[in-house]
C-alpha cells in the first residue's frame, strides 16, 4: 500500500495515500488537525506544510508514495475555561455531570462532582473541525459538497468531546458509568453538527434549522444522555441562551447588550422582559484567518499592542512574535488610526503620507499602499485592514439595528456584556477607537469569560434549570439582517475608522 511519512515535532508516523486525495484530505482522515480556514479551497494559506523540503499547501498537493511531510507544531496556547462559576453546593445526587462549550474554534469541558457541586476536572482543545474551515459557513459548505461531509464533521467533533470527557474522568479516577448527563452549548450549527443533523437549511434564506433543540433530542455520549441548550434561531444558538442565563441578564431589569464575537457575531439586547437578537457574519478576521500574518490565539500570537513612543506587545507563550490574533489586530489598528497611519476610510497610508515618527515602520506594496511592519515577521497590509474593516462594520451595524428595534440610543444602555475568549482579551478602548463597539464608562462594560460554559454548567448541576433555559430562548425575538435596508445603511456607515459616538 502506498504511504507517506509524516513528521510533527517528535512524532513520526505513516499514513496511506492514493492518486486522487489531497494531503489535507489524507490528514483529516488520519485525525491530524491542520488549520484550513477557507475549507481547503486554496485561498487562506493556513495549511502550509513542507513536502520533501518544499513549502506546499496541503489542500493543493496530492502526495506520492514515499513523500516526507513535515507539519507545523500542533497549536499551543491557553483556551479560556474561566467563567462565571455557579455556587458550589450539594445537588442531592451522586456521580458526576459534564458541561461542554462547543465553540467554533475551541472546545471546553468541565466535569462536576454532583455530591459537592464543585468542579472536579477541566479539559479543553482546539476544535478539530478547523481542518474543514474556520467558520460555520465553510463547514456548512463542506457538508453540501462532500457526500460524507456531515458524518465526517459530526464524527470528528464527537470523537474530540468524547476524548476530552475521558481525560476529565481519568483525572478524577472516575468511570464513565458515573457520568449522569452531558450538557452541551454551542452555536446552532455546532450543535446540529454534533447531533449529526443536516445544516443545509442554514445555507439559504429563510435560514431555518431542522431543530432549535427546544424539544429533547435523543443522544448519548459515553453512555450518558446529552442535553442540548435550546437555540433562539438558526444563527443565534444555545451558547447565547446559556450566556443570557448565566449572566443573570434573563432576570435583570434594564436594557443590556450581550455580545459574543467570533467568526459569527451573536448579540442580544434586552433584559427580563425579553430580548431582540441577531447574528452578523464577521468573517474569520477576529480568529486570525483572512489576515496575512493572522493566527488564532496560540503560542507566538501577538495578543496586545501598546504605543508610548515605542511599540510594546504581549506574545502568547512569551516567545518570539509570529503573527497577530484578533485582539492584537484590533489594538494595532486602533494605534495606527490614532497615529495617522490608517485614515478614516480605512486606507493604510504609504510612508510619505504619515507622521515622521511612523515612517520607519512602513514600506509600500506594488499598488502604492502602505505595509506596516510591527516586527520583521509580523506586518499589516491594506488587505488586512480591509478584512478587519468588514468585520468590525458588521458588529457595529448589528448593534445599531438592535438599538433601533428597541427604540433606544447608546447612552441609554445599562451595560454591555462581552462573552467568550475574544471578549476577555479585547481592549474595549481599541474596539471603540476603530468604531467597532460603543465607548462606555468602565462600570457599564463587563467581560464575563466563557459564559456559554457557565450556562451549560448551571444545567449540568441542576437539570431543572432546563425550563429556565427554554424560557430564555423563547423570549428572544430574532431579527434576520439579510436584505434589511437599515442594516445595509448601518454597515456602510460602520466602514469608517472612527468612534461610534461620532457617527
Feature map (PLM): residue ranges:
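Glycine-rich phosphate-binding loop of actin/hexokinase-like ATP-binding domains
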Residues: 109, 117-135, 201-216, 242, ...
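Catalytic phosphate/nucleotide-handling subdomain of diverse soluble enzymes
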Residues: 271-273, 404, 408-473
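A contiguous, well-structured pocket-lining segment that forms one wall/lid of small-molecule binding clefts
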Residues: 337-406
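Local cysteine-cluster metal-coordination motifs and their immediate loop/turn environment
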Residues: 33-64
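Short beta-strand-loop/turn "lid" adjacent to the catalytic site in phosphate-handling enzymes
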Residues: 174-208, 433-438
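Phosphate/ATP-binding catalytic cores across multiple sugar-kinase/actin-like superfamilies
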Residues: 160-171, 240-243, 389-411
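Acidic, glycine/GT-rich loop-and beta-edge segments that sit at the periphery of enzyme/chaperone cores
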Residues: 4-5, 74, 78-83, 223-242, ...
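Fe-S ferredoxin-like electron-transfer domains
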Residues: 4, 53-102, 107
